[in-house]
Amino acid sequence: MLVPNPPTSDGYWETLWPHLRSFSPDEQRVAVALYRELSKGAAIDDAQLARALGIAPAEIRALLQRDSIKSLTYADGEGRVLGFGGLAATPMHHRFEVDGRELWTWCAWDSLFIPEILRRTAHVASPDPETGEIVRLVVSPGEIKSVKPAKAVISFIRPDAQIFGTSVANVISRFCHFIFFFASLESGENAFALAKRFNAHNFGAELLVGRQRLARGSFDGSIGVAGSSRGSGSGCDARRLSTGRSIRA
């Protein structure tokens, strides 16, 4: 069911942005290093991250305890990082392949902005939670190159101030858990009607604007990517993916 007076994608980002973590320059470097080391496909220990940053392991442990980093990190029993900021080295719903290595993302949105941080093209495969149909995307550092099926959409949930900045468990269960790719708008509407959630919306390639804001706004100066994230790519039907229509979740 469509929600009356749905937000535009710009309006959504204006609402979401204040809730996202900000990073100091040294925290940006740690965050980008975490993403890039995780993209190698295995858990990260302090020594590995220290080598990547050229600093002592003791300094790494202190940096990982900063609130902005800690609230986006989860680790195994030995303290090795298994996931950070939407990227995981352990299985989740959204498969995210980079350079032939199998990774996963916490939600559908993560797969749109992380390629820019990694400076790598990702092949995404994510089951529609309503029908089981696999939504496939090729996402480069600068654009969404292809989407199949062409009518695919992505759902979003309105941000809650109590979610962000608390814990990884909260972010995943109360935010990421409602952000999926659907093979069609109708599928998304059906899924959220059944779930009886009332604050989700479907957007599409318009989210390129949002992923640019996140990747550049949070990690500006640490990503090292030139160029623009505008455009949908020759293989992506932006009109289909940018309806901006809303669904009741």
State where each predicted segment sits.
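Long, low-complexity, charge-rich intrinsically disordered regions
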Residues: 120-123, 133-249
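Short, amphipathic alpha-helical interaction segments positioned at domain boundaries
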Residues: 85-118
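Short acidic, hydrophobic short linear motifs in intrinsically disordered regions
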Residues: 39-53
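Short alpha-helical segments that sit at the start of domains
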Residues: 3-31
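Short amphipathic alpha-helical interaction segments
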Residues: 54-68
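Short amphipathic alpha-helical elements of helix-turn-helix/winged-helix folds
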Residues: 33-37
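A short, conserved structural fragment
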Residues: 68-79
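Short cysteine-rich clusters marking metal-coordination/redox-active sites
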Residues: 128
